[in-house]
Amino acid sequence: MAMKKLLIASLLFSSATVYGAEGFVVKDIHFEGLQRVAVGAALLSMPVRTGDAVNDEDISNTIRALFATGNFEDVRVLRDGDTLLVQVKERPTIASITFSGNKSVKDDMLKQNLEASGVRVGESLDRTTIADIEKGLEDFYYSVGKYSASVKAVVTPLPRNRVDLKLVFQEGVSAEIQQINIVGNHAFTTDELISHFQLRDEVPWWNVVGDRKYQKQKLAGDLETLRSYYLDRGYARFNIDSTQVSLTPDKKGIYVTVNITEGDQYKLSGVEVSGNLAGHSAEIEQLTKIEPGELYNGTKVTKMEDDIKKLLGRYGYAYPRVQSMPEINDADKTVKLRVNVDAGNRFYVRKIRFEGNDTSKDAVLRREMRQMEGAWLGSDLVDQGKERLNRLGFFETVDTDTQRVPGSPDQVDVVYKVKERNTGSFNFGIGYGTESGVSFQAGVQQDNWLGTGYAVGINGTKNDYQTYAELSVTNPYFTVDGVSLGGRLFYNDFQADDADLSDYTNKSYGTDVTLGFPINEYNSLRAGLGYVHNSLSNMQPQVAMWRYLYSMGEHPSTSDQDNSFKTDDFTFNYGWTYNKLDRGYFPTDGSRVNLTGKVTIPGSDNEYYKVTLDTATYVPIDDDHKWVVLGRTRWGYGDGLGGKEMPFYENFYAGGSSTVRGFQSNTIGPKAVYFPHQASNYDPDYDYECATQDGAKDLCKSDDAVGGNAMAVASLEFITPTPFISDKYANSVRTSFFWDMGTVWDTNWDSSQYSGYPDYSDPSNIRMSAGIALQWMSPLGPLVFSYAQPFKKYDGDKAEQFQFNIGKTW
């Protein structure tokens, strides 16, 4: 049989033997070389069918179509009479993908990039794509200064036309900057200019995280920094003429040279605003005022443009265009700024939508909105909604997106995109100290119950000295106006002796109800009523305790430690909160002030009042809010009314993870001074340091904390980026260095009567500590670790350097 052979093998272009103008009619099509690809699939990809008359062009199109499927690396077309014989060589299938030597780039990231290029297990191997990936990865290494890096793809054949693909990396070392030169600078020294760069050719010995590694992206950023530095100081003609980056022969060193032209300094002669101002010319004019003789400043010009856009955005102009054109007069060295404004269309809000709130109900988010559907768009109202969502503490991130409605010239949708965090926490605390040993506490809190926004807490403690249970529920939107309603039930069996406090037992239970009233965006008031029953027993005679009992008309014996006393109190509870933090957890900017207090009302056995003031202020010191200074204070004071004293069990305490770290919880402040026991049940274990008078025991000092009716605590904290934590988890982990100080005192202590004992009425006995803290928003809830070293303490204070707590952040 005579066979006329046509051979065509090309990846992109094909050629065929000419069959003549009339061609031939295909009566059958046969394939050779198919393994993975089905015959039917191959036929469907061909433009030629049985019965078609074909010519050279049809054959070429067939070749191209088969190559376009990506399944073949070679295609041959043969004619055997009226039969078309297609011989193919399939591309091998990737059986596995592995990596070797990659340290700077993680395997997961490499796999994602490969899959984005169509390279994955089970797919055909495209050698052209692999070559492009090799080059792309090498370019990446070059951009971060690793010029000796190489990436090679190793393809290992396997049976059944399969291959193993292995990318072998030789990353090498990062080239270090040997010198940065700036040529053409006269007004500023090179050192002064380089001090604002991210890249460095010298690193001080104390900068343990600094390096001299070169990165292309950082150089681009530094050039913009250099440009802004000059433009902000009046150099309107400043120009970067060229930049050279030179490698040493061993590719380990880099020299960077930046050639600039400074030009002269220019002053602003005026600002002229024109265009479509949408009737807000007077307000825009206020934003463009300049001081006579003011130097041209590029940053101020940009800020002015942004301020005009924000102003128009508040009135519904969602997409204004503002362009500033400096008109430079070289003769008198002045710049006249011409600002062209096009407000564009004014937009209504058609819908407000929420994305990412898988747990939180839409209504919980919608009630925080200040922008209304159907109203003019207000960018400030949209931003207020974002702030309020952040302050809820339910979300890791909140972003907004204003989307135009297709086909409408004046409508937009506002989309809030949230990333929810775990708002429930299992509170479990462990502390260890040189004197205290190990201590525990536990509880459960859910701030967004079933996505309704309700805060529900069930807390319980069971240890050697306390059995405590509490149920609390708060509805933040009891009314549509934002009036909140909260309630609490609790039971507490507390044996102070076993807690290293003054010796007594108190079994109490009670309830309270509180209403919260929003005043404006940042202020709210609270008011409520409470009831508590206290049953005191096993009260060992102690000066401050007996002083309270005497004020209540009780005269227990100082030789009896089995005294008991019961009270029923009704209280009016009140509070005020100012909250302008940027978000509900891990804030980075703003402040919060919380004032709480209570006073007994008629029908109570006790008569007293108690006030606590907490403040926190966050001040970011960089634009990204990664470096933040935090200042916190806590003030407390209480006293009796009508000649009575405030109950000793209502005293303030300090020490522990929420006040002065490095000290055991509640141990800072006045210590118990006991009367000597004469009864038959006298326990010699309570015989501490007893003074004598006329041969008889007088009073006994101890290390048992009793608290006081006044407290002052302050903390200064420096929040820093957490080392070795990627940006993905930066919002979930916080590291800080702190300095805590605080004191507790008793204003009713009579130092003249007890001259031989410490003056517990002196507020100047301030304790201090310093240390480091780590907070993590874990799946279990917030975890807080701290290590603090007390450096100012007094006799009787108990240190607890390491403290660990789940369930509390600040």
UniProtKB/Swiss-Prot annotation:
One of its GO terms (cellular component) is Bam protein complex. It comes from the Bacteria. Residues 1-20 form the signal peptide. Its main location: membrane. Residues 24-91, 92-172, 175-263, 266-344, 347-421 form the POTRA domain. The keyword DNA-binding does not apply. It is found in: Cell outer membrane. InterPro entries: Bac_surfAg_D15, BamA/TamA_POTRA, D15-like, OM_assembly_BamA, POTRA. The keyword Transmembrane applies. GO terms for biological process: Gram-negative-bacterium-type cell outer membrane assembly; protein insertion into membrane. Belongs to the BamA family. Part of the Bam complex, which is composed of the outer membrane protein BamA, and four lipoproteins BamB, BamC, BamD and BamE. PANTHER family: OUTER MEMBRANE PROTEIN ASSEMBLY FACTOR BAMA, SORTING AND ASSEMBLY MACHINERY SAMM50 PROTEIN FAMILY MEMBER. Part of the outer membrane protein assembly complex, which is involved in assembly and insertion of beta-barrel proteins into the outer membrane. Constitutes, with BamD, the core component of the assembly machinery. This is Outer membrane protein assembly factor BamA. It comes from Escherichia coli O81 (strain ED1a).
